[in-house]
Regions:
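Short, ordered, surface-exposed loop/turn motifs in non-cytosolic proteins
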Residues: 86-122
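Short, hydrophobic beta-strand segments
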Residues: 137-144
Length: 180
């Protein structure tokens, strides 16, 4: 990288974006199926949905590297299935977990590292990534769901169990929901 005289602002985002259309409102969407595994040539649905941002302002030319501290700008939801007192049998090790009623499209301000959901696109459902036998995670666009509506669905052997709630997905925050 050639440095000219003067000061510069350095911005970095992960994962890499192939086409940057706007620094102020770059379109971005989380994967609807975040349980899709990564391959030799592409990220899995979960990893491709997470955005990390770093910036360093007023950098001048030098031989030293520019230090960048990355932070998450999306929200993370973790769901744990816990065996309750009245549950008979064993917890399923292969369930399908859906996060419903979320905006999955957003714009990103690549100068500020701020994600804003796109209210002009219909709410959708996300298939969560299975972390282990009873834990699931999904990356969600920051948003506040103020109306009580279907929130989580756990599908086991063709039977669905629903949980309704309001929810506030904050940027850079991991939320944990225990389903008993």
């Amino acid at each position: 990288l050639y440095w000219d005289d003067g000061t510069f602002n350095v911005y970095a985002i992960y994962p890499r974006m192939d086409k940057v259309l706007s620094l102020d409102s770059q379109p971005f969407s989380v994967a609807l199926d975040q349980n899709t595994p990564k391959t030799a040539t592409s990220l899995g649905g979960y990893e491709a949905s997470d955005l990390l941002f770093a910036s360093q302002k007023s950098v001048t030319a030098s031989d030293s590297p520019v230090s960048l501290l990355f932070h998450h700008i999306m929200s993370k939801l973790r769901i744990r299935l816990i065996k309750g007192e009245d549950f008979e049998g064993e917890l399923p090790t292969k369930a399908k977990v859906y996060i419903h009623s979320t905006f999955t499209s957003a714009t990103v301000d690549l100068r500020q590292g701020i994600v804003t959901y796109n209210p002009n696109v219909a709410r959708q459902s996300i298939i969560a990534h299975q972390d282990d036998e009873t834990s699931y995670s999904a990356i969600v666009v920051p948003q506040n769901i103020t109306t009580r509506m279907p929130f989580l669905e756990v599908e086991v052997n063709g039977v669905s169990y629903f949980y309704e709630s309001r929810f506030n997905y904050k940027p850079g925050v991991e939320n944990l929901v225990n389903l008993i």
